[in-house]
Amino acid sequence: MFQRKCKITFICHGSTIYLEDNRFTNKLDYPPINENGESEIKKITDFIKKRGLKTNKIYSSPALCCTQSAEIIADELKQDFETINALTNRNYGDWNGYTFEELTKKYNDKNISADCPENGEDIKDFNKRINDILAEIISKNLRGRIIIVTHPEVIQAAICNALKIPAENEYKIYIRPGSATQISYFTDWASLVYSGHVPI
């Protein structure tokens, strides 16, 4: 029961102009991390290095903001990283490019964070996608310690799946840019070690 299968440290990509504006996006090629984002990733990389624990593998979403962040981490740890398409952000469909405030005004009768955007991905389907890819990653890295560089929403989904929190409540979990979240996966359960950690 207490035999650990895998330990995953999720790193949220560094700040972007969209993230700072609370703007929904699932574009792969824009926006890049900004100056603040680069600084955040360097700080979290230093935190990882100081812990001195071996990282067996680094994975990343293929989105530009994530691969830029992963490259900084991989260079410092002197490792390569692998992109996985299923680690991309939720497909926001017609909401893509809008801020949370703009959508709240447009759809005042909807729970923007939980509802399914037109031509987009339902929150439960999104969480299942993340659960499925994490199960696949874990099966390939048994007894390993890995890093996944991805989006806040992906990390929220991972936490919800690990702790069996309903998908529609995942927006209540705050994940800061450039932060680390760690989950230990066991045979029949998972443990959230820490969430949204940002080095002082």
Q: Where in the sequence are the language-model features?
A:
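Active-site-proximal alpha-helix that buttresses catalytic centers in soluble enzyme cores
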Residues: 6, 11-79
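Generic structural signal for well-ordered alpha-helical scaffold segments
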Residues: 42-49, 127, 131-139, 159
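Short active-site segment of divalent metal-dependent hydrolases/proteases
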Residues: 16, 154-155
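Active-site signature of alpha/beta-hydrolase-fold catalytic machinery across serine-
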Residues: 72, 157, 161
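Acidic, low-complexity terminal tails and accessory targeting/binding regions
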Residues: 1-7, 50-51, 79-83, 90-101, ...
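Phosphate-handling substructures
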Residues: 32, 75-132, 194
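Short basic (Lys/Arg) and small-residue
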Residues: 151
